[in-house]
Amino acid sequence: MKYNFDEVIDRSNNRSSKYDERLKKFGTEDVIPLWVADMDFKTAQPIIDACKKKAEEGIWGYTSRPASYFEAVQEWEEKYYGWKPETSHMSWCLGVVQTMAALMKIYTMPGDKVLIQTPVYSEFYDIPEAIGRVVVENPLVEENGSWHVDYEDFERKVKECKVFLLCNPHNPLGLVWDKEDLEKMAKICMENGVMLISDEIHSDLIFHGKKHTRTATISKEIHDYVVTCVSVTKTFNLAGLQASTTIFPNLRMKADFDRYWSSMDIHRNNAFSSVAIEAAYREGREWLDQLLPYLSANFDFVKEYCEKNIPQIKPNIPDATYLVWLDCRDLGMSNEELRKFMIEKAKIGLNEGYTFGRSLTGFMR
């Protein structure tokens, strides 16, 4: 099937937070909302068909999770990432952010320290702080527009932490970590008894010939220290259905995690996410294979447009995710001036860079 990603869809009346929250977030509805990882494309037709079939049943009671659900995850992992995690080591959760919050609540105490690499997805700050943990930053180092790990700083700071939250691939920089970096970070965590939680939600969205490596696959020793968080909700634009899969290194941790959610009676997919997620894994690849070059062409357009028309803004073209990190420092604006400029002059609603790294000035995503 040929998909039309050029189709413009009016989302102003479909209860989209991306559009409906413009006034609250930007003080005006007169902006193009580009502030959340949410595409404006219809999802794959097999997913739509699965949801239509479920809707037509007319009964949406408590939902079971058939064995085929996690088997679909397993088959995707084996086919595209070269590993075959046991389905018995998988747990459902509402989302990757909720998974990270739960794991920190289960395995750390208030006041414990959590390591993050900035600039990074703002929830990596917000969730630990909301539950009383202390965030420790290992700032990524920028050199000539590329970013890398400061390992001396990483090794020093990880010693005082209980958890390392890894963004793999990295949001907002679009970094596809190579195996050597992943191995080095993971070994340092292992040597210091630090749990490594790997957020890999953007791993299906890879460009420019890069290849994603699951952190847990580097070695058997590293596997035993890594909790892997995956989901196809970003991949197929299904975030509103709330579903992710957590892959544990052992059954003990899975049992701890399942017990935590069961204590709140939160352990079932909703009726539509159950069928939609399985359809995505089993029948969505054709759509994804057409999406990726379309997104890559969008990146080319952004790069060429900025170079030609606004050279003061330098886009960091990502190798992963569909998000672009903008270096606006040459505009010479404060963070507040830059925010106002984007809203009032450019008429676009973006994320301020300082929410990804609190000491940063002059960046947007």
Predicted region positions:
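N-terminal small-domain helix-loop-helix segment of the aminotransferase-like
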Residues: K2-G95, A102, A280-E283
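Short Gly/Ser/Thr- and Asp/Glu-enriched loop/turn motifs at secondary-structure junctions
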Residues: E86-T87, I317-Y322, T361
